[in-house]
Every structure is written in structure tokens, then in C-alpha cells.
Amino acid sequence: MKQEFQYSETHYGAAPCRPDVHGVLIKGKRGRLLSVLYTAAGEGTHPTVLLLHGIPGCEKNYDLAQDLRRAGFHVLSFHYSGSWGSDGDYSLAHDLEDANTALNFILSDERFGFDKDRIYAVGHSLGGFVCGQLSASRPEIRKAVLITPCDIGRLPVIREQAPDYYRAVCEVLEESAD
């Protein structure tokens, strides 16, 4: 006996009221930062997490983004300049600037319902290091979570290739050790 599959459409509310995933291009100093925005269900503004991935990529962080979205947060994850299709050339020295650019996008955008008073940052590995720097310099970030942050300030290659960045990193590490 042949069974027939029945299909019925599910209609959701307006786009801001249902969970969704958006591709977002954020304009940075070296071109576009390719970004993914997870929006939570429900009307009104939502607390927002800026999710900073490590290098080489972010595929390990998407499960965290999904969980945060289910918990009612909007989550923005971007790719650093020169990585994973974002414009420009990659440099560790530009990571913090890219994170500031993404944060400025959250603070200035009016389309997606970001709660500007409830912005959090979460970073893993290199993203954890950048997250620490960002949260130390930007009071708009209420809380930060650093997941196994790397200590790139102690790497000799950074000292040689980007001495100004190395000095800034060492200052942050010394301050956080106090």
C-alpha cells in the first residue's frame, strides 16, 4: 500500500519575532567582514553576544551560538580581516580592530533589535585573547567569557613582526595578572 506524504506549511510571525540566521557584511577598514548573526525568537530587543572565534576558524563555535540563541540572545560572529572570505590581509595586529568594528556595528544597527545595554563578549582561543582586550577597553561590554584564551603576547614571532602590538599585549597581560 502506497502512503502519501502530507506537507503543511508552518507560518511564523514577522522575521524579528522568530529565530533566524542572517549573513551580514560589516564594513571595516580593510573591506567587508563576513559575519553570521543568529537572532533569537520574540519581539523587542534582545541581549547580544559578540562571539569571537579562534584561528583558523569558527565552525566549532556555531553550536555555542545556537545554544545562546535558544536562551534568548542574539549572537554575532564575524571572520577577521583576510580570513574565511573577509576582505583584506590577515594579521594578528588587526584582530582587535576588527572586533571593535563588529561591536560598533552592534551599537549602531537598528534593524536587528540589539539591546545596547546588554552586550556581552565570548571568545575562544585567539578569540578569547581578543575578547579580553576588547572587554578591557570597551565599557559597553557588560561581561566577557574567555574560553581557553591563548597567550599570544609571549610568542617570539609576535615580538619580531609586530613590536608595538607585542608591547600592548604585554601590558594587558601584566594588568590582568594583578
Regions found by a protein language model. Give the residues of each.
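Alpha/beta-hydrolase active-site loop
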Residues: 90-112
